């Protein structure tokens, strides 16, 4: 009787562990990609290629790639990595009143949208602000996409969309 109870408890613990680990894996690789023509039209209509803010001009520089470099633990996933730079083209420091909040990458009718993390590039000059997302969809490489970032004014809460068109998705080997 005692052995049967222990076996049942072990089975329950094993099932709980399987459920928990499965849900963590799903969250780790969840990607928000939608097909929404209204959202796409809104993004394009509100986007600019140069943002004028506090007497400075800003543009977006974007690097998109998938890392196929061998080494380290073997990965099943090769997500799209987006490294974006808000660049003050007047070479003045980026305003502390600007907050880069969201990324949109448009691949024909598909839109990947995601939050951005602080960039990891060393020695970025103060007229550039680097942000990163390393968990994008597994789209083909050597295709052109449009990249948009959403920027918020911390003073007025106004939101701006800044676009860079025809950015190539590179493959790192």
List each language-model region with its residue ranges.
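Mid-length scaffold segments of soluble, non-membrane domains
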Residues: 85-111
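Bacterial signal peptide processing site
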Residues: 25-27
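Short beta-strand elements
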Residues: 158-173
């Amino acid at each position: 009787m005692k052995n049967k109870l222990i076996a049942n408890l072990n089975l329950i613990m094993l099932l709980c562990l399987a459920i928990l680990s499965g849900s963590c894996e799903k969250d780790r690789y969840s990607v928000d990609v939608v097909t929404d023509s209204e959202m796409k039209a809104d993004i394009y209509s509100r986007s600019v290629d140069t943002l004028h803010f506090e007497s400075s001009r800003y543009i977006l520089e974007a690097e998109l790639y998938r890392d196929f470099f061998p080494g380290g633990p073997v990965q099943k996933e090769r997500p799209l990595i987006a490294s974006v730079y808000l660049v003050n083209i007047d070479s003045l420091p980026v305003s502390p009143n600007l907050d880069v909040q969201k990324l949109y990458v448009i691949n024909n009718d598909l839109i990947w949208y995601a939050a951005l993390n602080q960039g990891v590039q060393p020695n970025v000059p103060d007229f550039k602000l680097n942000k990163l997302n390393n968990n994008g969809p597994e789209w083909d490489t050597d295709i052109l996409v449009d990249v948009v970032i959403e920027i918020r004014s911390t003073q007025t809460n106004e939101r701006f969309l800044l676009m860079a068109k025809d950015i190539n998705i590179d493959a790192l080997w």
